[in-house]
Design a protein with these regions (language model features):
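Phosphate/nucleotide-binding beta-alpha loop and adjacent structural elements of enzyme active sites
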Residues: 1-247
Length: 247
């Protein structure tokens, strides 16, 4: 794998060194997280540090943004090419002591083995983003695999287990192309009580009429949907859209 080194300056003035892979969308992804602040990391209160969770970490954009603001980060990413890049990006900035990586696929339960399939295009984030997502019934997962691409076998981890030894979470970000519905389908009230903010890339399914409201129902109505405040507009339709939920 060939890497190119670059550097971004965040809106809060932090300089972040990065590696990107030739022929991929890594640079654009990192730019949107670090320079454009896609997940609104600058808005978070970091006066007491704290812990954040990055599910679907990809190249590490959100993770690096959070680490640069002084948060400890727990990341989840199953694809080996991505986890290698994330570790390189964390290490080059000297933030390894504040970083934990689960090289697993997010799921409703831990300890299962699932087959993930890579997309053939280098610009694809990863197969697990596509093979889960049309249902919150995990029994249907393996029927949603791509028909082409390379396959790997990985173990799963649940949100409950990720947060087992964590007292509080300032932000939980999730971007896993549909897996959010399964991931949150069995989350305990104990885990949800620990989380202050959730930013999710929601992927509507065929039955979804208002995915923002349905996702808030899924997380137990413990949060206020402030998507319109954070992102200025909402397209309430069965499609992809960022959503922000706050206690």
């Amino acid at each position: 794998m060939e890497y190119k080194q670059d550097k971004f300056t965040t809106s809060w003035g932090a300089e972040v060194k990065v590696f990107t892979r030739e022929g991929t969308n890594d640079w654009n992804t990192l730019y949107s997280c670090l320079v454009e602040d896609e997940y609104l990391v600058a808005d978070l209160d970091n006066s007491n540090g704290g812990v954040c969770v990055d599910i679907g970490a990809h190249a590490g954009g959100c993770t690096l943004a959070l680490l640069s603001r002084g948060f400890k980060v727990i990341a989840v990413e199953p694809l080996p090419e991505n986890t290698e890049l994330i570790m390189k990006n964390v290490e080059i900035n000297g933030w390894s002591n504040n970083f934990t990586l689960h090289k697993k696929a997010i799921s409703d339960v831990s300890g299962k083995s699932v087959i993930l399939r890579y997309g053939n295009e280098k610009t694809e984030s990863g197969a697990h983003h596509r093979f889960i997502g049309n249902t919150i019934d995990s029994s249907e997962w393996q029927e949603n695999l791509w028909t082409q691409g390379r396959e790997i076998k990985v173990d799963t981890v649940s949100i409950d287990d990720i947060l087992k030894n964590v007292n509080s979470v300032n932000l939980l970000k999730i971007d896993c192309e549909g897996a959010e519905w399964s991931a949150f389908s069995k989350v305990s009230s104990t885990s949800l009580d620990k989380i202050d903010n959730i930013v999710a890339e929601l992927h509507g399914v065929a039955s979804t009429k208002n995915m923002y409201q349905e996702f808030n129902n899924l997380i137990g109505l413990k949060f206020n949907d402030i998507t319109s405040v954070k992102f200025k507009n909402i397209n309430n339709q069965p499609t992809i859209g960022l959503a922000y939920f706050k206690k």
